[in-house]
Amino acid sequence: MEAAGCSYQFRIALLGDAGVGKTSLLRCYVAGARGAAEPDPEPTVGVEFYSRALQLPAGLRVKLQLWDTAGQECFRCITRSFYRNMVGVLLVFDVTNRESFEHIQAWHQEVVSTQGPDKVVFLLVGHKCDLNTRCVSSQEAEELAASLGMGFMETSAKSNCNVDLAFDTVTSAIEQALQQGDIKLDKDWAGVRLLHRSPNPRSSSRKQDSGTCQC
């Protein structure tokens, strides 16, 4: 079983406008290095989820429950109900679509207003960095991420650029916050669940890279 040997389960969501490539990012990550580029998938209807087990540098093995949310306004009432049970959020925009970038603050505010900023690890993700028709600069995105107190990374599911790194960065940050007591287990909160106890996993001291992709 995928959860065998996993100490925790982390719920992580991808949020952003429709068409920014959230589903492609998730499928690329779950498929791993064996995955191949695929045609643009159909838009997500409501919420779908994937899972993957991950061995962290500190020695801890965790199960990731990865939630793919619809970006269309007609599904927002459905997806909002899931926000309070997320511990990690990738806020995704399309570097070739300025409007999707301008909506990031609204997506961020929706999560914060649901459960506050303390329980959630955020990462701003500029997707489709392989395309040469960008209308959002890396500098502008970095400035927005800094103003919201999160890291920034550029990715491309098509070229498999920084896809693993984006998810692994969020996961390691969650694990570190958990070990430091900044995130606490709560039986009424599904963001982090204890699957079985492990013998004192040491906290990771490795700093997370948040460099941009040279696509």
Swiss-Prot record:
Coarse class of the protein's main subcellular location: membrane
GO molecular function: GTP binding; GTPase activity
Activation/inhibition comment: Regulated by guanine nucleotide exchange factors (GEFs) which promote the exchange of bound GDP for free GTP. Regulated by GTPase activating proteins (GAPs) which increase the GTP hydrolysis activity. Inhibited by GDP dissociation inhibitors (GDIs).
Documented EC number(s): 3.6.5.2
Residues engaged in binding GTP: 19, 21-23, 44, 71, 128, 130, 157-158
Record-level GO cellular component terms: membrane
Lipidation, S-geranylgeranyl cysteine type: 213, 215
Reactions the enzyme catalyzes: GTP + H2O = GDP + phosphate + H(+)
Keyword annotations from UniProtKB, A to Z: GTP-binding, Hydrolase, Lipoprotein, Magnesium, Membrane, Metal-binding, Nucleotide-binding, Prenylation
Binding site for Mg(2+): 23, 44, 68
Names of the cofactor(s): Mg(2+)
Pfam family, one: Ras
Region annotation (Disordered) ranges: 196-215
Cell compartments where the protein resides: Membrane
Domain notes: Switch I, switch II and the interswitch regions are characteristic of Rab GTPases and mediate the interactions with Rab downstream effectors. The switch regions undergo conformational changes upon nucleotide binding which drive interaction with specific sets of effector proteins, with most effectors only binding to GTP-bound Rab.
Function noted in UniProt: The small GTPases Rab are key regulators of intracellular membrane trafficking, from the formation of transport vesicles to their fusion with membranes. Rabs cycle between an inactive GDP-bound form and an active GTP-bound form that is able to recruit to membranes different sets of downstream effectors directly responsible for vesicle formation, movement, tethering and fusion. The physiological function of RAB42 remains undefined.
Family classification: Belongs to the small GTPase superfamily. Rab family.
PANTHER family associated with the record: DRAB11-RELATED
Name of the protein in its database record: Ras-related protein Rab-42
Organism: Mus musculus (Mouse)
